[in-house]
């Protein structure tokens, strides 16, 4: 019976190792990385706040593109690598970049709005804007330069980390909590201490990506779907999880 037990422990340990792959990245590439993104083509994007740079690598660690700006910026997602939205609160503008990280579109908010705290690009036409100066949530068609809707939205803007709008619900991640609102700014749900870096949607699932774990919103709470306790940063694409740990990049397949 004891031998049978040890066999299963060995099998579990072997399977755990086979699920992990050390990707071919130089440790210098991974130092001082503040954010990590992975698209569904196996490409990895590393953001460094030190020089406001985003660098794209293939799965072998070969550089495919590099973007450097003069002000800090926030990449929303690389789920569509042909149109990567990037918002700079300092510059008050949203830029879209192509698969080579070349700029293909710029939307400047200074002339039309007050102070935009956060942006969510719903698609290639519509944006959701949180205007801190007017305390409003704005639905904006930037292709037509037209405001579609504007809602009073008197919430705490100061600590906002990320924003997502889906099916008439507004998901707000802050340094303090995670909250869900309707368009009247009525709070539907609040979960304190989310400790997340960004919100991500996969089909109907809302995910919170933290420093070392990824959680899924499950009714009124979070369910952990991936965790790497010693990780510096984690992220995922539709097929795998990515972990930076001790200046190495690992890939985990479920």
PLM regions: where:
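Bacterial Sec-dependent N-terminal signal peptides
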Residues: 1-24
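Start-of-domain marker
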Residues: 20-83
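A short beta-strand motif characteristic of beta-propeller blades
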Residues: 21-29, 61-68, 103-110, 145-154, ...
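Repeated scaffold domains used in trafficking and secretory/extracellular systems
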Residues: 30-37, 71-78, 113-122, 157-167, ...
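Short beta-strand elements that form the blades of beta-propeller/WD-repeat-like
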Residues: 35-48, 82-88, 125-131, 165-173, ...
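Hydrophobic/aromatic beta-strand positions that recur at structurally equivalent sites within the blades
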Residues: 47, 55-57, 96-99, 138-140, ...
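Hydrophobic, well-structured mid-protein blocks that either form specific transmembrane helices
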Residues: 110-163
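Intrinsically disordered, low-complexity segments enriched in Gly and acidic/Ser/Thr residues
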Residues: 177-227
């Amino acid at each position: 019976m004891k031998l049978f037990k040890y066999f299963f422990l060995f099998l579990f340990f072997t399977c755990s190792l086979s699920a992990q792959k050390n990707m071919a990245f130089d440790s210098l590439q991974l130092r001082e990385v503040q954010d990590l993104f992975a698209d569904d083509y196996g490409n990895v994007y590393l953001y460094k706040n030190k020089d406001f740079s985003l660098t794209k690598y293939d799965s072998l660690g070969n550089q495919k593109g590099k973007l450097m700006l003069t002000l800090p910026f926030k990449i929303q997602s690389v789920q569509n690598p042909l149109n990567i939205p990037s918002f700079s609160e300092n510059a008050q503008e949203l830029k879209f970049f192509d698969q080579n990280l070349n700029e293909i579109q710029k939307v400047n908010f200074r002339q039309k709005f007050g102070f935009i705290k956060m942006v969510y690009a719903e698609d290639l036409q519509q944006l959701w804007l949180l205007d801190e100066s007017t305390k409003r949530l704005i639905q904006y068609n930037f292709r037509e330069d037209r405001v579609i809707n504007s809602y009073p939205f008197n919430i705490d803007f100061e600590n906002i980390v990320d924003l997502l709008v889906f099916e008439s619900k507004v998901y707000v991640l802050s340094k303090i909590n995670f909250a869900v609102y309707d368009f009247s700014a009525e709070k539907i749900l609040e979960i304190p201490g989310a400790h997340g870096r960004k919100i991500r949607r996969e089909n109907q699932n809302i995910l919170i990506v933290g420093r070392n774990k990824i959680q899924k919103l499950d009714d009124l709470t979070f369910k952990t779907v991936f965790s790497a306790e010693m990780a510096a940063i984690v992220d995922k694409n539709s097929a795998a999880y990515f972990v930076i740990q001790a200046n190495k990049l690992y890939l985990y397949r479920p």
